[in-house]
Each structure stands twice: as structure tokens, then as C-alpha cells.
Amino acid sequence: MLIIAGLGNPGSKYAGNRHNIGFLAVDAIHRRHSFSPWSKKFKAAIAEGELGGEKVLLIKPQTYMNLSGEAVGEAMRFYKLQPADLVAIYDELDLPAGKARLKTGGGHGGHNGIKSLDAHCGKEYRRLRLGIGHPGVKEMVQNHVLGDFAKADNAWLEPLLDTLADNADMLVRNEDSQLMNKIALALGGKADEEKPRKDSEKKPAGQSHIRQARNNNQPKLPATGPMADMLKKMFGNKGE
């Protein structure tokens, strides 16, 4: 069983906030697949269903962001799940709007919802961070995070949520890099490029393969004999 927890704040006042992109992501998955209607349990809104043949619980904590771990932790204890059975989806200030990153474990990065999850659920769960961009100055962060998405944001927000919902079964199959590539391509970016070769495999710095070939195949000139005498007459000795 896998729990997919979207983080956010409950109530209509916060529904369109950037801080609630985790709720929006889980709602998109719920709409796209055959999940039960939302119900209340574990201090949260929950819905049950299947993705990729595995049972999945969608959860939106109703405790407010700072106490998200209370709800998710209660659900994990009820189902006897481990941190590896949890995916948390939440907003990330330090990623450009529309970018996504998915990894296991790590720090909370100042995110209070993740601080709470770390305390109640352990740290080795998968974290899907969805970029909302940074306003540029620290003083504007709170208004930015708790502000609603602008209409212009739909240009990246809709394809991001649609692609995540369409490919949510990849979360079940642990196809994390493939999912990130699909999201990047949907947003007009590039898939992850091939990793650079190891130093031992690289060509010598500053030399093309042609130059290397020349260096390795230079002919040896005769030092004595008639040919050497002729070359000396034509070109002279080096250093003269």
C-alpha cells in the first residue's frame, strides 16, 4: 500500500494558495483515477483506490500545514506502513515555478509541513517538490506563499498537474526519474541529459580527437645520412 499525501491548509480561504499546490496535485490524481469519494478520517480527508494494481490512499491533512504529520502519521500507524510507503507532495520556494523534483529523504528546507512529517513519520519517505518560485526578497515570502495563483500561472500549473495525474502510477512503480522527465517535457523543458563521462574516460583537456591522433602518429625524421643532409639544407637546424 502507498500513501500519497498532499500538503496544504484546509478551507476555502486557502484553496487557491501557492502553499496548497500539494492539495491541488492530490485532487488532480483523485479526479483522473477511480478513487472513492473523499471522507474524513485520521484528522484528514482521505480517498481509497488503486494505481498500477496497488492499493493507494490519498490524504489531505486537515490539521493546517504545521501539524500535517499528525494526520499522516496516524494513517501510517493504522495501516502499519513504513516511511518508504509514503509520498509527500508539497510546494517548494527554491524551485522555479513549474519545476519538479522527487527524491527520498533529505532536509525540510524550512518547510513547516515537512518538519511535522519528519517528526511523526520518519525521514526516509519520498518527497515530490513542486516549484512555486521565489518572490525575490525574504520580506515578500509569506504573502507569496499564502497568495493565490495568478491566472498567468495556469500556463504551467495545468500541464504540471495534468501530467502528474496522468502518470501517477509511476509513483507506485518507483519510476521517479521517468516521471520527472515526463513533467519536464510537458512544461517545455528537456529530459534529463546523459550523465558526463568519468574523468578517466575524457579526452585530454584542450585537444580534439584529431589533434590527439596527430600527436600519436608523428613521423620520425632521419638524423643522419643523405636525407638528413638535404633537410638541413632546406630548413636549417632548429634554434639557429
Swiss-Prot record:
The active site is at H19. One of its GO terms (biological process) is rescue of stalled ribosome. Residues 190-240 are annotated as: Disordered. The record marks D91 as: Stabilizes the basic form of H active site to accept a proton. TRNA binds at Y14, Y64, N66, N112. It catalyses: an N-acyl-L-alpha-aminoacyl-tRNA + H2O = an N-acyl-L-amino acid + a tRNA + H(+). Pfam families: Pept_tRNA_hydro. GO terms for cellular component: cytoplasm. The record marks N9 as: Discriminates between blocked and unblocked aminoacyl-tRNA. InterPro entries: Pept_tRNA_hydro, Pept_tRNA_hydro_CS, Pept_tRNA_hydro_sf. Residues 190-204 have a biased composition (Basic and acidic residues). One of its GO terms (molecular function) is peptidyl-tRNA hydrolase activity. Its EC number is 3.1.1.29. It is found in: Cytoplasm. Its main location: cytoplasm. Hydrolyzes ribosome-free peptidyl-tRNAs (with 1 or more amino acids incorporated), which drop off the ribosome during protein synthesis, or as a result of ribosome stalling. PANTHER family: PEPTIDYL-TRNA HYDROLASE. Belongs to the PTH family. Monomer. This is Peptidyl-tRNA hydrolase. It comes from Rhizobium etli (strain ATCC 51251 / DSM 11541 / JCM 21823 / NBRC 15573 / CFN 42).
